[in-house]
């Protein structure tokens, strides 16, 4: 079939398998160009490995460090008449390229919050790898099914305490609007922590540890975002921030446990990037369009892949073997360039000036839109979007 982009809200409902493969190839090429990571991991589990930072982590491990990888994700395959999710095609492409280089690659399509997912991964590790030396936790899910009761819990992207009103961009109509978000209830805050906090990360490490499949020096990392006062009301000071603070709590507990055998647990605070997850957060698209333009001008721009390669090579797996620099809460900070005072001051000054008319001139909004559509495999140079493609793509994946 011929597949064209169809956008609804902040999601593109169609995906292009050839475009998604090209995205993965581009990240692999970038990783290889940067060279091998001297003390990199060799057997890596990525929970949430099909897009964004999780996918880049799997690529950094495999193509930057020749690691065997197991990827866990929840995606929909395509059929003969309907495209699957971008994450499905990304994972299929990763598997194809990894196997072509003789790298071990196993993928599990399942609910990562479930007991079954953890048991299946343990089984695979015991059978094929013996143990693993790194666990990346990179889940971005709006819903969590509690593994014991089966109850569905939903997260809320809402402020706490008072209604939040701010200048934002309507990405469908490409115009500046005033976005208003009502505050979260106590229940919504608690539910957001349940879905997006550190509990499931702890359950993963507990299951892996009890099964005896964590190597002595195993490192685990979970991803977070803090941002600045421009986005704090909706993010760090909102319901989502409470969940991210719970990740810090979990990291502390896990670090105590793992450091006893030479391992470590850290939260890595990353920069804002264009992902399906960030596009759903009110105000983030406009902030990203502003900050990206300034960071590009300063030569500091990084996408997911550049960020993660820097985290692997300059923080977690340094050539000199030293421990990564951390902040006072033991977090690895890769938002350092974004938070530079001159960059943030630029955004603060710009925010009140942006109108629908000058949006594309003052910010990188056009580039934001292009990067967003690229997540789904569209708008990539060298791909013939009028060509007939088969949306049904099979690969070596275990379905639970």
UniProtKB/Swiss-Prot annotation:
<comment type="pathway">
    <text>Lipid metabolism; fatty acid biosynthesis.</text>
</comment>
<feature type="active site" description="Proton donor">
    <location>
        <position position="235"/>
    </location>
</feature>
<dbReference type="InterPro" id="IPR050048">
    <property type="entry name" value="FabV-like_NADH_b"/>
</dbReference>
<dbReference type="InterPro" id="IPR024910">
    <property type="entry name" value="Enoyl-CoA_Rdtase_cat_dom"/>
</dbReference>
<comment type="subunit">
    <text>Monomer.</text>
</comment>
<dbReference type="GO" id="GO:0004318">
    <property type="term" value="F:enoyl-[acyl-carrier-protein] reductase (NADH) activity"/>
</dbReference>
<dbReference type="GO" id="GO:0050343">
    <property type="term" value="F:trans-2-enoyl-CoA reductase (NADH) activity"/>
</dbReference>
<protein>
    <recommendedName>
        <fullName>Enoyl-[acyl-carrier-protein] reductase [NADH]</fullName>
        <ecNumber>1.3.1.9</ecNumber>
    </recommendedName>
</protein>
<dbReference type="GO" id="GO:0006633">
    <property type="term" value="P:fatty acid biosynthetic process"/>
</dbReference>
<dbReference type="Pfam" id="PF12242">
    <property type="entry name" value="Eno-Rase_NADH_b"/>
</dbReference>
<feature type="binding site">
    <location>
        <begin position="74"/>
        <end position="75"/>
    </location>
    <ligand>
        <name>NAD(+)</name>
    </ligand>
</feature>
<keyword id="KW-0275">Fatty acid biosynthesis</keyword>
<feature type="binding site">
    <location>
        <begin position="111"/>
        <end position="112"/>
    </location>
    <ligand>
        <name>NAD(+)</name>
    </ligand>
</feature>
<feature type="binding site">
    <location>
        <begin position="48"/>
        <end position="53"/>
    </location>
    <ligand>
        <name>NAD(+)</name>
    </ligand>
</feature>
<dbReference type="InterPro" id="IPR010758">
    <property type="entry name" value="Trans-2-enoyl-CoA_reductase"/>
</dbReference>
<dbReference type="Pfam" id="PF12241">
    <property type="entry name" value="Enoyl_reductase"/>
</dbReference>
<feature type="binding site">
    <location>
        <position position="225"/>
    </location>
    <ligand>
        <name>substrate</name>
    </ligand>
</feature>
<dbReference type="InterPro" id="IPR024906">
    <property type="entry name" value="Eno_Rdtase_FAD-bd_dom"/>
</dbReference>
<dbReference type="GO" id="GO:0051287">
    <property type="term" value="F:NAD binding"/>
</dbReference>
<feature type="binding site">
    <location>
        <position position="244"/>
    </location>
    <ligand>
        <name>NAD(+)</name>
    </ligand>
</feature>
<feature type="binding site">
    <location>
        <begin position="139"/>
        <end position="140"/>
    </location>
    <ligand>
        <name>NAD(+)</name>
    </ligand>
</feature>
<comment type="function">
    <text>Involved in the final reduction of the elongation cycle of fatty acid synthesis (FAS II). Catalyzes the reduction of a carbon-carbon double bond in an enoyl moiety that is covalently linked to an acyl carrier protein (ACP).</text>
</comment>
<keyword id="KW-0520">NAD</keyword>
<comment type="similarity">
    <text>Belongs to the TER reductase family.</text>
</comment>
<feature type="site" description="Plays an important role in discriminating NADH against NADPH">
    <location>
        <position position="75"/>
    </location>
</feature>
<feature type="binding site">
    <location>
        <begin position="273"/>
        <end position="275"/>
    </location>
    <ligand>
        <name>NAD(+)</name>
    </ligand>
</feature>
<keyword id="KW-0443">Lipid metabolism</keyword>
<keyword id="KW-0444">Lipid biosynthesis</keyword>
<keyword id="KW-0560">Oxidoreductase</keyword>
<keyword id="KW-0276">Fatty acid metabolism</keyword>
<dbReference type="Pfam" id="PF07055">
    <property type="entry name" value="Eno-Rase_FAD_bd"/>
</dbReference>
């Amino acid at each position: 079939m011929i597949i064209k982009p169809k956008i609804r809200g902040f999601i593109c409902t169609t995906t292009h398998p050839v475009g998604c493969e090209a995205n993965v190839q581009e990240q692999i090429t970038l990783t290889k160009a940067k060279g091998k990571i001297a003390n990199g991991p060799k057997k890596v589990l990525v929970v949430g490995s099909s897009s964004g930072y999780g996918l880049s982590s799997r690529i950094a491990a495999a193509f930057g460090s020749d690691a065997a990888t197991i990827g866990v994700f929840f995606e929909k395959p395509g059929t003969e008449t309907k495209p699957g999710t971008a994450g499905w095609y990304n994972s299929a492409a990763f598997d194809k390229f990894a196997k072509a280089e003789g790298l071990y690659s196993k993928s599990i399509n399942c609910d990562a919050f479930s007991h079954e997912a953890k048991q299946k991964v343990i089984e695979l590790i015991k059978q094929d790898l013996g143990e693993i030396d790194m666990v990346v936790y990179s889940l971005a899910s709006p819903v969590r099914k509690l593994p014991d009761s089966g109850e569905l819990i939903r997260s809320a992207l809402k402020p706490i305490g008072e209604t939040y009103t701010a200048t934002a961009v309507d990405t469908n109509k490409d115009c500046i609007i005033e976005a208003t978000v009502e505050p979260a209830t106590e229940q919504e805050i608690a539910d957001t922590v349940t879905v997006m906090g550190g509990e499931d990360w702890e359950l993963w490490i507990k299951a892996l540890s009890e099964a005896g499949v964590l190597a002595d020096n195993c490192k685990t990392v979970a991803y977070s975002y803090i941002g600045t006062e421009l986005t704090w009301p909706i993010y760090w000071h909102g319901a989502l921030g409470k969940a991210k603070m719970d990740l810090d709590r979990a990291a502390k507990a896990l670090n105590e446990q793992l450091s006893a055998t030479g391992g470590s647990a850290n939260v890595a605070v990353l920069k804002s990037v264009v992902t399906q997850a960030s596009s759903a957060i009110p105000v983030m698209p406009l902030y990203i369009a502003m900050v990206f333009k300034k960071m590009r001008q300063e030569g500091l721009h990084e996408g997911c892949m550049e960020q993660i390669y820097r985290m692997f090579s300059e923080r977690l797996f340094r050539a000199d073997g030293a421990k990564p620099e951390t902040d006072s809460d033991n977090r690895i900070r890769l938002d350092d360039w974004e938070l530079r005072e001159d960059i943030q001051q630029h955004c603060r000054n710009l925010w009140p000036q942006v109108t629908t008319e000058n949006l594309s001139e003052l910010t990188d909004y056009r580039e934001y839109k292009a990067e967003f559509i690229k997540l789904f495999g569209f708008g990539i140079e060298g791909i013939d979007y009028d060509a007939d493609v088969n949306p049904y793509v099979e690969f070596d994946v275990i379905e639970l």
